[in-house]
């Protein structure tokens, strides 16, 4: 039972003023611009866009600024704004094979067509605090080193490269996913509620906007023995992909821009079943921006959730689609947990009365000890 109450209007307005002051901080300190957030906190921006289901770096930066860095609150703001936007059409499926690659690695093949492209990554840093970053560059001209780094990043983009999983496909060693007859439109979770059992397309939608921390924990559990799969990173790629529309009025597709994406294809050994030969199976992850950890966790959980269709026993939480999909959304989780701090006066009073009555009844039933 939820009890709706109306608080004092003046108190609420004052609370909102205090919130704005706390968000701004010391007025003597220069305020963050959206460009600074977008450029220098790009990984946070990518997470907000992914879990907010809206690709717009400027709006994601605004949401982070308004939420004072609270990622889940920023995701809430972006999703709320998304509901106000008109839907003008649908793009054709993104062609990640045609990605302009900034980073591309494989843990399964050392020498692969197009080569390993390290790109920007924390993987080879020492995880030591860089105190050079404490320098306040306000009013300073860009250093030659900074200009050189920017030029290097610009030159680092590589053209389309073949998918690593295609190498296994050439030998027939990895499962294929043919397009279903009629190519039915996938269930749209942004317009229709989640229903069980959910097909893979619906599960992938849920995981794509699911909480990164939750998916990371679920993916981690699959590596600690709670499933029987041994994953390998077939390929992780990060770069830009064209968004293409095919308007009915035109006889040709039209590129309307490009977006940054991270894609992960995880391969797992599969011993085979009564209908399928031994082969490698796939787990898939896709996220906006540079979001490798999210894409990897998503691909691990995707593969775990495929246990029933592959004839595997469903024994662990990561394999139970109702458990995973019902608890992956951080807005639902945050809302349900945080509603506990709202007034529950009537609920608590009823339980308080009940506890008092139970204690009184227990006192009457307990025999009194004989006096000495």
Locations of the language-model features?
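Short secondary-structure junctions and interdomain/linker hinges
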Residues: 55, 85, 112-116, 175
